[in-house]
Amino acid sequence: MSLLLSNSALVGPKFRSSRISHASASLDIGLQRATSPQNASVATCFEETKGRIAKLFHKNELSVSTYDTAWVAMVPSPTSSEEPCFPACLNWLLENQCHDGSWARPHHHHMLKKDVLSSTLACILALKKWGVGEEQINRGLHFVELNFASATEKGQITPMGFDIIFPAMLDNARGLSLNLQLEPTTLNDLIYKRDLELKRCNQSNSAEKEVYWAHIAEGMGKLQDWESVMKYQRKNGSLFNCPSTTAAAFTALRNSDCLNYLRLALEKFGSAVPAVYPLDIYSQLCTVDNLERLGISRYFLTEIQSVLDETYRSWLQGDEEIFMDASTCALAFRTLRMNGYNVTSDPITKILQECFSSSFRGNMTDINTTLEIYRASELILYPEERDLDQHNLRLKTFLEQELSSNGFIQSCQLGRNINAEVNQAIEYPFYAIMDRMAKRKNIENYNIDNTRILKTSYRSPNFGNKDFLSLSVEDFNRCQVIHREELRELERWVIENRLDELKFARSKAAYCYFSAAATIFSPELSDARMSWAKNGVLTTVVDDFFDVGGSVEELKNLIQLVELWDVDVSTQCCSPNVQIIFSALKHTICEIADKGFKLQGRSITDHIISIWLDLLYSMMKETELGIDKSFPTMDEYMSNAYVSFALGPIVLPALYLVGPKLSEEMVNHSEYHTLFKLMSTCGRLLNDIRGYERELKDGKISAVSLYIMNNGGEITTEAAISEMRSWIERDRRELLRLVLEENKSVLPKACKKLFWHMCTVVHLFYRKDDGFTSLDLHGVVNAIINEPIVLNQF
């Protein structure tokens, strides 16, 4: 880890050689088309950007904290209270004052004036304590006097504990005979805010007050019980991994472990310290999270795997760096669980219990922590995690209230589109937003600055930088070019197979392709995308044929043709519509089977035909039930309805085309069928909830109407829908658990992910309206396929 001496230096200089993941080399297919000098230059820039990002995995840079360095500079020698223990820190302060008299970091944000005031006053106190730097002290005092009004300015971001620490430092300044000419009204306002903050803390429970006061120990003066503070000392000797708090503790108690921590920090960083140390696990997880959320993780698979393995080892060892920090714990839990590691949710539940234990909001005053905990609390896999479920609902309500009242303004990151980010987290749960859609939103909401605020501001290129953004934008747009060409190919396929001549069928090629491109977006997975999209079009056509377009004779004829397979369509099709549909089916199945044969090394034709026959049989059964006006039991209905929802032909053939070998034993395994049933059941129930009233008017059955009927008509529609939603929730969580599970799994993870991807598709499609009728989808389709991201718009 090294320190960044400038807040603006988020990205280091270019370097000649770097470790780039070889595991993802094949994923550049279709992207490196350097057919002109301009394209060659773009390709070179692309690789250089990847190289700089790869370098972040081998170091963790943090910005210097002048505030913390000042408090460390105040530490007296253990052998003489008249001498500084760390004169190098004192020299650093003397050499790093700004031209305006402050000790601000270069290019500091205009909303960080309170931070600058606090840091500057701390530096003045350090110099005055040791009787050095009279010129710097006078310039610093002049800066504080000129900018003192900012200490109570409402539009400024207030660092943690500022309302207590800053007045305490002013008292210290008076005790050191520093002559500060301060505006009386502002000073009175500051004292009033300090008293208000102390009163608020005293009204919280004793444990919360104690930990908060311990964290801002340097500002508590005679109110501080230093022995109680030391309960929070960590194994590395620090208090909260915070140099300023630890320095104040050593000054008060001469604790040797505190001193050892400070010495180790300075051995690591030289003559200045960061605001938090160590931060290695969090920094590395932030890098991984940035890459995953922006859609560029596939370029760094080896590096990411190394971080995940190391984080998991630290998790199992109970590392304080993870479990003593809410943000790190939540991020580690979410990242590990979503990558298939077996981690318990107990630490997240404990954090949430502490957050909601009283009116003192503790961790939830910081937007980073709040969002991390919320995202982590969504990842419920097991029935016994019900407590986490309840806390998630409460946290969602809290976020909604804070959003409506602009409660995050004081705690947000600088330059961050916080409203959009929080709104996205609330409106689009992780299970109801398609992968590429989420990536685009994350890119659009991305904040290059990514300054964090504790008692002072701090930054790291691992938290965020322009390389993450530029690589993700370039990658998104390159993939989009490929996707647009594939959509044109799909539209040609529709015409070539005469599907456009079927007047009864909905024209949904763009939507079908969109669901493929938004979930299976990598360039080299073109065959899987096209299989998904073409079968999506065909299932829509067949669904409309069974629903409104075909007679019973035509439906039976279509099924018979698929059963026989090798037929003369000119003589054995009973109508032009049947001929068009069967011909398109056969041509597409054979095309997909040929591609699958090349990847799998065995014939998959019979299996794909079987998948289609299962769908046709289930649709025919529904037709016959409608004709007979008979009402099955709920179990009878669902045993057929999950198949007739028609996800089988879309998802199952595509499994053969995503890369891994899929043996006959695998596709006959119970895991394969369970994944399919869970995914399809979610889709069927979502569809039946949204279409309940329409189906009721048309005299058709649905899961909702049958549930009411099977319960003697004694429950309300609302109660029936509530039961359906609970069913969906159970199956969705079980599906995710099986997708993420690796130890007992038979299917390759790349194949299992497709079941989850489709689950997110149906959750999005049925969010508001009934399936394809959602007006929101039109804009989303354009954003994913047609509209490039323009970097200079950010």
From Swiss-Prot:
In this chain, Mg(2+) 2 is annotated as bound at: D543, D547
Judging by the UniProt lineage, the source's domain of life is Eukaryota
GO cellular component entries: chloroplast
Q: Where is the transit peptide?
A: 1-28
Q: Which organism is this protein's natural source?
A: Isodon rubescens (Rabdosia rubescens)
Q: What is this protein called?
A: Ent-kaurene synthase 5, chloroplastic
Record field: catalytic activity: ent-copalyl diphosphate = ent-kaur-16-ene + diphosphate
Per its UniProt record, what InterPro entries does this chain match? Isoprenoid_synthase_dom_sf (IPR008949), Terpene_cyclase_plant_C1 (IPR044814), Terpene_synth_N (IPR001906), Terpene_synth_N_sf (IPR036965), Terpene_synthase-like (IPR050148), Terpene_synthase_metal-bd (IPR005630), Terpenoid_cyclase/PrenylTrfase (IPR008930)
Q: Which cofactor does it need?
A: Mg(2+)
Q: Name one GO molecular function term.
A: ent-kaurene synthase activity
- The residues listed in the UniProt record as binding Mg(2+) 1, with positions renumbered to this chain, are D543, D547
Q: How is the cofactor bound?
A: Binds 3 Mg(2+) ions per subunit.
Tissue/organ expression: Ubiquitous expression in roots, stems, leaves and flowers.
